[in-house]
């Protein structure tokens, strides 16, 4: 019996030493995640269908009384017709406070609207008039006879203006008031489309022959040197506050963006960097960020895999934890292995499983050795 127990424990420890991809030593967190996925993927439609079927199986709607159905069956057998306890009304009640046969209350008999005279569609107006408080035969009140709108002269469509004019307070024959004769807009000289400017100019307050004011002759925009499209910059420059021949200010000569080193397309980056400020030389912004591989570790790993490195990623440099992997750049695909440098490689940070697995292997091995020793010497 003792030997059987030792054999069973030894077998368990041996099985625990198998690789994880063989189905043993499964990570508990992964198992929990799988269980959660299986639970979350349950089709809830089946539950709803079961609930609907249960409701339909009852065979009656809400508010029905099964006792009434039984009573009706008994009365049908007796040949008598049962009367409902609360007979339903087939017609809606009419609105109150009106006379019989009237659609609206507080009005006289035969009238569609109350508080008006007999035979009139609207109250508080004179007989034969569609609208009250106006003269006889007029469609709108408080105006002269034969006029569609009040408070204006005879024969005029709008009041307070001269005869024959469509708009008031202007001279005769003019479409707009307070301007000179024959002009479409006031307060300007004769023959000019806009006022307060010199003759023959499209915009005021500028010199003759200039499209915009307050600038030097022949210049499209003010406050700049002659022949320049934008002000406050050196002659021949398209933008101000920068060195001559530069497209943008506050940067070194030949740079497309300011506050960065020469030859850099993005700010705060080291020389030769196209993306990711504050990155190391030749390195873009990688997947691990703060865990970027240093040059020393890459060199050491390159010396180990120099003969086998190609255009595909190499295995990770570590078996657990954080390491690096490398591959050749496209332009260095045909280069000899002994001539490879760091500039010929692309590097990436790789993260393997936690190193706790190694500790488990060591501890299980020690336990197995102890059990074997006890089994042999007892």
Swiss-Prot record:
It is a lipid-anchor; GPI-anchor. Glycans are attached at residue 319. SMART domains: TSP1. PROSITE patterns: TSP1. The keyword Repeat applies. GO terms for cellular component: cell surface; cytoplasm; plasma membrane; side of membrane. Residues 304-356 form the TSP type-1 domain. Keywords: Cell membrane, Cytoplasm, Disulfide bond, Glycoprotein, GPI-anchor, Lipoprotein, Malaria, Membrane, Repeat, Signal, Sporozoite. Sequence repeats lie at residues 95-103, 104-112, 113-121, 122-130, 131-139, 140-148, 149-157, 158-166, 167-175, 176-184, 185-193, 194-202, 203-211, 212-220, 221-229, 230-238, 239-247, 248-256, 257-265. It holds the Pfam family TSP_1. During host cell invasion, proteolytically cleaved at the cell membrane in the region I by a papain-like cysteine protease of parasite origin. Cleavage is triggered by the sporozoite contact with highly sulfated heparan sulfate proteoglycans (HSPGs) present on the host hepatocyte cell surface. Cleavage exposes the TSP type-1 (TSR) domain and is required for productive invasion of host hepatocytes but not for adhesion to the host cell membrane. Cleavage is dispensable for sporozoite development in the oocyst, motility and for traversal of host and vector cells. O-glycosylated; maybe by POFUT2. Belongs to the plasmodium circumsporozoite protein family. This is Circumsporozoite protein. It comes from Plasmodium vivax (strain Belem).
């Amino acid at each position: 019996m003792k030997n059987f127990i030792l054999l069973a424990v030894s077998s368990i420890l041996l099985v625990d030493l198998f690789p994880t991809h063989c189905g043993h030593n499964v990570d508990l967190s992964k198992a929990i995640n799988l269980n959660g996925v299986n639970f979350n993927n349950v089709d809830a439609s089946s539950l709803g269908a079961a609930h609907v079927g249960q409701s339909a199986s009852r065979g009656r709607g809400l508010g029905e009384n099964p006792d009434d159905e039984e009573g009706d069956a008994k009365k049908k057998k007796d040949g008598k017709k049962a009367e409902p306890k609360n007979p339903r009304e087939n017609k809606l009640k009419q609105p109150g406070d009106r006379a019989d046969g009237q659609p609206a209350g507080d009005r006289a008999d035969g009238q569609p609207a109350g508080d008006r005279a007999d035979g009139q569609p609207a109250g508080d107006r004179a007989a034969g008039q569609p609208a009250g408080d106006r003269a006889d035969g007029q469609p709108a009140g408080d105006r002269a006879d034969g006029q569609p709108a009040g408070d204006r002269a005879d024969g005029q469509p709008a009041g307070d203006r001269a005869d024959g004019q469509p708009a008031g307070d202007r001279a005769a024959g003019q479409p707009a008031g307070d301007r000179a004769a024959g002009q479409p807009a006031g307060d300007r000289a004769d023959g000019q489309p806009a006022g307060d400017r010199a003759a023959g100019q499209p915009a005021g307050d500028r010199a003759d022959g200039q499209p915009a004011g307050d600038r030097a002759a022949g210049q499209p925009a003010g406050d700049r040197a002659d022949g320049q499209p934008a002000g406050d910059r050196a002659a021949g420059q398209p933008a101000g506050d920068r060195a001559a021949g530069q497209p943008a200010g506050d940067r070194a000569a030949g740079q497309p963006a300011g506050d960065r080193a020469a030859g850099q397309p993005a700010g705060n980056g080291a020389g030769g960097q196209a993306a990711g400020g504050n990155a190391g030389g030749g390195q873009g912004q990688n997947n691990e960020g703060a865990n970027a591989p240093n040059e020393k570790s890459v060199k050491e790993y390159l010396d180990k895999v120099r003969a086998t490195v190609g255009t595909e990623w190499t295995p990770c440099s570590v078996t657990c934890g954080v390491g690096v992997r490398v591959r050749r750049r496209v332009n260095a695909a045909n280069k000899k292995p002994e001539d490879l440098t760091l500039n010929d490689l692309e590097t990436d940070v790789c993260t393997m499983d936690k190193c706790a697995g190694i500790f488990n292997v060591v501890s299980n091995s020690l336990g197995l050795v102890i059990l074997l020793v006890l089994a042999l010497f007892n």
